[in-house]
Amino acid sequence: QAEEPSVESLVSQYFQTVTDYGKDLMEKVKSPELQAQAKAYFEKSKEQLTPLVKKAGTDLVNFLSYFVELRTQPATQ
């Protein structure tokens, strides 16, 4: 069986895709001023979103782990 990608791996892949898209977009833009604004926007967005996405990933893993632990505990009678 193939391993499923981790939340961190998916988040990293998402940010890499967004970064690549931003770089491609900046190459298509000819105005240096517009390029600088776009670069600043992407950097600021990444800076602000990274902690939120990491926390959401951690919270999701903890939430799912709770249910896995419930299933593995023997039922008390």
From Swiss-Prot:
Tissue specificity of this protein: Plasma.
Pfam families per record: ApoA-II
Superkingdom of source: Eukaryota
InterPro entries in the record: ApoA-II (IPR006801), ApoA-II_sf (IPR036172)
Gene Ontology biological process terms in this record: cholesterol homeostasis; cholesterol transport; lipoprotein metabolic process; peptidyl-methionine modification; positive regulation of interleukin-8 production; positive regulation of phagocytosis; protein oxidation; protein stabilization
Modified residues (Methionine sulfoxide): 26
Family: Belongs to the apolipoprotein A2 family.
Identification of the protein by name: Apolipoprotein A-II
Native source organism of the sequence: Macaca mulatta (Rhesus macaque)
